[in-house]
Amino acid sequence: TPIKSSAASDVYKRQGLDIFKALGSDVRIEIIKLLIENKEMNMNELAAKLNITNGALTGHIKKLEACGIVNTSNDSSGHGNQKICTLHLDKILIDLDAPEEAQNVYNAELQVGHYCNYEVYPTCGLATASHLIGEVDDTRYFAHPDRYNADILWFSKGFVEYEIPNFIPGSQKITQILISAELSSEAPGINNVWPSDISFYLNDVCIGTWTSPGDFGDVRGIFTPDWWFPNWNQYGLLKMLVINKKGTFIDGLQISDVTIRDFNLDYRSSMKLRMAVNDNAEHVGGLTIFGKSFGNYGQDIKVSINYAPIEE
């Protein structure tokens, strides 16, 4: 669905202003640092660490919560009713460049199990929100009919490939593709320090590689279901892959000079996105892809396609 830029732009400006205001305080920066180090803390613990009163802390927490940086919840498991604070955002990306063709965007989501091609090697497996699909470390189950419902998959090397839906209007060319997905490495068990070189391909052309730092299991993922094993991958990092006329970027950092113009894509084009851990990579550390029922972000693989009229 096309997004009209004027109203959306005003909303984004207001959101950005609130975030900058929230970060304009040494105390609030210290709160963020403490929550990064400790994952979660109650109000009493934070106030003691910061040497301020609970009343003063409440005002700071409200500002951080209002712009989505911090979440609060009530925990009545201990003595009394404690308010627990956790960090909601792990990154803030500031894009000072005006969005290109922002009024013409097609958005879609791909479930983790909707791959159209794969070649994977153990350790590997996949699961829906409620159960494992078949047995782990048996690649045959990547062809099981239930795999379309998969919300998480993992493998030590190989690839999965997705067909990107292209339903932009006729007589339009593609000017940018943005992919957003929660990813991590795949270690035997869990290991927060387990680098893996994950390469991204568009229509069989490598557009760049990102090194995942680890396979994270120190705390349970926010959306990871209760039945999931505690010593298995719990959450990943939300990565934003963008290819446009300037190159290919991960989280705003350029990873290659491959541009969208190299593909000459329009409303008739088919597009395939491959995520791979290659045999010849420096770090062959596997790949885990998290869907909306696992990890920390509650989303599937999101795709945004910017388009503009084809010039005659």
Residue spans for each PLM region:
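Single conserved hydrophobic/aromatic residue that forms the stacking wall/gate
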Residues: 1-8, 12
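Short, cationic-aromatic polyanion-contact patches
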Residues: 21-25, 42, 75-97
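Alpha-helical residues within the helix-turn-helix
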Residues: 48, 65-66
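Amphipathic alpha-helical dimerization/coiled-coil segments
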Residues: 90-154, 158
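Extended, solvent-exposed segments with strong compositional bias
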Residues: 141-153, 211-267, 283
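Short beta-strands within extracellular/lumenal beta-sheet-rich domains
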Residues: 151-172, 255-259
